[in-house]
């Protein structure tokens, strides 16, 4: 069950492991990647929990302005890199705009290449986060899961977990700001599926995309093997 992958942290709502998902050669491995919303604070217990999941590195996908306004507490505890994704800080106004906004992030190939090399070169586990852990994090994690041979249904199901964990926060945000469209903010499975379809039409697939970014085939294959386990 996807809910069994949740990582319990005191100040983070939307943290979960990318391990345990059905993949082409078995299941995705734990201790490789976790995803979350921004950890604004981390207790000693939280740090121990993340380390128990193998986390030694953190990739922050937010804009420089977001990082300056709300620094990630993970920076002081782990090997940290901030890579703002193209258009990632722009909020879609309607649900129909969501898949196109996700595809636009993949067009920022300089930023995406830097992020993917960081993930590929990390010797241990990496926590990937943005602000809510939905859009930018969702795009990067979808590419990783495609590479591992995870089915579209499982990728969309993982993405939709954010709706469960973050809905109270989104309801509050929309109540405070009438310009926000709740329907465009929630993590709908159909939005992720539309992105996956558009991504393949544009790039061919995850391996083709990573090679376009400059990762060589041997590096991609080792990365794929690291992400999956037999059985």
Regions found by a protein language model. Give the residues of each.
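Cys-dependent protein tyrosine phosphatase-like superfamily
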Residues: 1-127, 140-231
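Ser/Thr-glycine-rich phosphate-binding loops at phosphate-binding pockets of nucleotides
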Residues: 132, 136-137
């Amino acid at each position: 069950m996807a809910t069994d992958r949740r990582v319990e942290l005191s100040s983070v709502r939307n943290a979960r492991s990318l391990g345990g998902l059905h993949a082409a050669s078995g299941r995705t491995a734990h201790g490789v990647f976790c995803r979350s919303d921004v950890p604004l604070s981390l207790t000693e217990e939280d740090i121990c929990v993340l380390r128990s999941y193998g986390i030694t590195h953190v990739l922050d996908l937010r804009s420089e302005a977001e990082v300056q306004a709300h620094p990630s507490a993970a920076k002081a505890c782990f090997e940290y890199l901030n890579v703002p994704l193209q258009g990632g800080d722009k909020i879609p106004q309607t649900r129909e705009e969501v898949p196109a906004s996700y595809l636009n992030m993949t067009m920022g190939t300089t930023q995406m290449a830097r992020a993917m090399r960081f993930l590929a070169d990390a010797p241990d586990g990496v926590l990937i986060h943005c602000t809510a852990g939905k859009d930018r994090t969702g795009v990067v994690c979808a590419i990783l899961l495609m590479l591992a041979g995870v089915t579209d249904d499982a990728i969309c199901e993982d993405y939709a977990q954010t709706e469960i964990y973050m809905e109270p926060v989104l309801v509050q945000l929309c109540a405070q700001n009438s310009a926000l469209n709740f329907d465009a903010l929630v993590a709908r499975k159909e939005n992720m599926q539309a992105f996956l379809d558009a991504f393949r039409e544009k790039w061919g697939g995850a391996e083709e995309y990573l090679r376009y970014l400059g990762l060589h085939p041997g590096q991609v294959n080792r990365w794929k093997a690291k992400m999956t386990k037999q059985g």
